[in-house]
Amino acid sequence: MKHPLETLLSAAGILLLALLSCLLLPAPSLGLTLAQKLVETFHMMDLNQLYTVLFCLWFLALGAIEYLVLRWVWRRWFSLER
């Protein structure tokens, strides 16, 4: 039997961890030469577009990792199935 609030707590935990990761974890910063090389490689307009894509991918990856960690913790210590 699943816990009745498991889906609600999972979503709330993901949102809380996403907020904490946005506030506390540093996003990657590239050097100017590497950033300009990536802009040319991916045919982007300017550095703003590159950093927008970079931040989206960064926080998407962090969110996926945090989701997996939260799910593992929930099933390991708080699950009712034992």
Curated annotation (Swiss-Prot):
It is found in: Cell membrane. Keywords: Cell membrane, Membrane, Transmembrane, Transmembrane helix. Pfam families: DUF1158. It is a multi-pass membrane protein. GO terms for cellular component: plasma membrane. The chain crosses the membrane at residues 8-28, 50-70. PROSITE patterns: PROKAR_LIPOPROTEIN (PS51257). This is Uncharacterized protein in ramA 3'region. It comes from Klebsiella pneumoniae. The lineage of its organism: Bacteria, Pseudomonadati, Pseudomonadota, Gammaproteobacteria, Enterobacterales.
